[in-house]
UniProtKB/Swiss-Prot annotation:
Organism of provenance: Scolopendra viridicornis nigra
Ranges where the record places region Disordered: 26-45
Main location: secreted
Name listed for the protein in its UniProt record: Scolopendra 20417.15 Da toxin
InterPro entries, per the entry: CAP_sf
Any single Gene Ontology cellular-component annotation: extracellular region
Record lineage: Eukaryota, Metazoa, Ecdysozoa, Arthropoda, Myriapoda
Tissue note: Expressed by the venom gland.
Keyword entries, A-Z: Disulfide bond, Neurotoxin, Secreted, Toxin
Length: 45
């Protein structure tokens, strides 16, 4: 088996980052059970 490609393309990276930022935003807003809200949690870009 020969590896042809590795890593994520730009579209996959953007989708992963958007999902991560959405989860961080829920925590920051205090919408995630068991997690305190954040006063200053910036998005990743």
């Amino acid at each position: 088996c020969q590896m042809v490609e590795r890593g994520l393309d730009a579209k996959a990276k953007a989708a992963m980052l958007d999902a991560h930022d959405x989860a961080r935003q829920k925590v920051a807003n205090g919408q995630e059970a068991g997690q305190p809200g954040a006063x200053n949690m910036k998005e990743l870009h």
